[in-house]
């Protein structure tokens, strides 16, 4: 199974100035059973990349066309020659419409922020379209999932279509029974 992860256009997948999405993708990729089948696509000018399976999409910026559209088109050029079975899109619901026109892979969209503030998921119609065009929608909290669901009746959506994956890939156990020592 070939898996491609498409980062947001301005996300740095580098140890310098990495954003929350890059850190999440790096951590989950390292622990994934599919890590050898994953390619991560992004656009950064920094040389030190987190992982060797990162592919930098060099694009020429344009004042006449959306740089995000140019970025997605560049990704689709790779997909033409080495098609993915599954594509993860992080935090860019507006990429979905463009990807579904030219691709047959299963799409999974991750929401790391409030869906109602993002281009491509602000309106109920846009969110309904995302439900129809994606295989899964993943949220980083129950709150962001509930924001996405605003305006839908609970019977309109398949329950297994929406999942919550918290941003921590390591579970830390805290012993609350351990008593603090009083030093005073």
Mark where each language-model region is.
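Short His-centered aromatic/hydrophobic patch
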Residues: 89-95, 111
């Amino acid at each position: 199974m070939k898996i491609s992860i498409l980062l947001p256009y301005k996300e740095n997948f580098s140890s310098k100035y990495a954003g929350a999405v890059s850190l999440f993708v790096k951590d989950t990729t390292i622990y994934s059973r599919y890590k050898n089948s994953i390619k991560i696509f992004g656009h950064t000018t920094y040389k030190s990349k987190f992982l060797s399976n990162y592919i930098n999409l060099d694009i020429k910026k344009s004042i006449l066309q959306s740089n995000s559209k140019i970025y997605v088109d560049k990704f689709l050029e790779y997909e033409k020659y080495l098609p993915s079975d599954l594509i993860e899109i992080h935090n860019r619901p507006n990429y979905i419409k463009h990807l579904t026109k030219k691709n047959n892979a299963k799409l999974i969209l991750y929401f790391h922020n409030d869906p109602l503030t993002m281009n491509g998921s602000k309106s109920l119609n846009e969110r309904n379209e995302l439900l129809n065009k994606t295989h899964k929608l993943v949220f980083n909290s129950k709150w962001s999932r509930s924001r996405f669901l605003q305006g839908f009746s609970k019977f309109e959506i398949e329950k297994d279509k929406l999942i919550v994956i918290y941003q921590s890939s390591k579970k830390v156990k805290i012993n609350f029974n351990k008593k603090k020592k009083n030093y005073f």
